[in-house]
Amino acid sequence: SDDELCADAPHSTEEVEAYEAARIENRAFWERKAAEDPQGLESEIIHALIGDRPLHPSQREVLEHLRAGRNTLAVMATGRGKSLTFQVHAALLALAQRKASVFVYPLRALIADQAFHLSETLEGFGIAVSVLTGESTPEERRQVMAELTDGSCDIVLTTPEFLAYHADKLARCGRIGFAVIDEAHHIGLAKAGQR
């Protein structure tokens, strides 16, 4: 429930500061791991996201293409782990190169769900996840843009409309190294003039 989620959030200034200090400490540990053992880091991230299950060959292939810096279109059946591949790559970029990623989703409900799960899963690595949609207040937008610029935000989840309107602001932060359009088949299903 929302009450349970809010109960776990830090409330006092001291709690917020302690949380941020722990995030920075975790981040430093995993950045060292990225420099010393990138394959080990990738395994740790995969384990955090899916446990002990092995990757499918198609997932390994997508990750190899992304690692090589290739633009990649991944078409897989539902439940075959497309999201896992780009989430792993984004986490690796954040820790190894301090690059941020933008994930574009067709629905705000999907953004909310993914943001919750990604934040919960990746916080142990010191990776920060934010949301920018048409529902974001001007202050929230300014804060996320500032965090993108200063390196304290690593992954932004947004909608096609927000991206189209604010792409220049996102680009000006200078840290975007990876962009993903999830559920891209919805683009062709939208009304004329949209998406």
Please name every model-derived segment.
Residues 1-72, 127-130, 171-184, 188, ...:
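Helicase-associated low-complexity/disordered flanking segments
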Residues 55, 79, 158-159:
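Membrane-integral, polyisoprenol-dependent glycosyltransferases
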Residues 68, 77, 116-120, 125, ...:
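ASCE RecA-like P-loop NTPase motor cores
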Residues 68-74, 99-101, 153-154:
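Pre-Walker A (Motif I) flank of P-loop NTPase domains
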Residues 74, 103, 130, 156-158, ...:
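Hydrophobic positions in the central parallel beta-sheet of the AAA+
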Residues 75-80, 85-116, 123-128:
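Conserved SF1/SF2 helicase motif Ia
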Residues 87, 95, 116, 136-178, ...:
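Conserved helix/coil segment N-terminal to the catalytic DExD/H
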